[in-house]
């Protein structure tokens, strides 16, 4: 939201959850507490191969104020929040073939997608298997 460029490649070597969402998406907002819980639990965890865990949130919002307000209201405290404010025409959504949200992709330390659309306790249990 601060206007800085964020790149997924900066997180190589870590487990990354790419989370496509939007402030106007009720199912996304209902899932956010589970994402926050997983972040809190695994942000400092030791992983078998990876050097940590990060979340890369990609918003499909059009309105920056609504997007920023939702980040604050849902307590999405990680650093990596991006949006081109292009709604469904988002370049990232096109690249990942996202046509419904919430949509998540779990990426390993090599940059390979290892799981998709993890929700609720499934996200935590999947991350648990990757820890030492």
Residue ranges and their predicted role:
Residues 36-39, 64, 68, 124-127:
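Extracytoplasmic/secreted envelope proteins and their assembly/folding machinery
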Residues 15, 32-58, 131:
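Conserved helix-turn-beta segment immediately C-terminal to the redox Cys motif
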Residues 7, 16-21, 56, 82:
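Conserved Rossmann-like nucleotide-binding pocket used by diverse enzymes
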């Amino acid at each position: 939201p601060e206007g800085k460029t964020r790149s997924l490649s900066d997180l190589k070597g870590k487990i990354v959850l790419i989370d496509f969402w939007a402030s106007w998406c009720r199912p996304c907002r209902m899932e956010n507490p589970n994402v926050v819980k997983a972040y809190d639990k695994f942000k400092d965890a030791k992983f078998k191969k990876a050097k940590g865990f990060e979340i890369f949130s990609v918003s499909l919002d059009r309105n920056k104020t609504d997007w920023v307000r939702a980040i604050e209201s849902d307590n999405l405290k990680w650093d990596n929040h991006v949006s081109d404010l292009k709604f469904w025409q988002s370049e990232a959504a096109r690249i990942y073939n996202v046509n419904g949200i919430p949509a998540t992709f779990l990426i390993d330390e090599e940059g390979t997608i290892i799981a998709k659309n993890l929700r609720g306790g499934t996200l935590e249990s999947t991350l648990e298997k990757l820890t030492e």
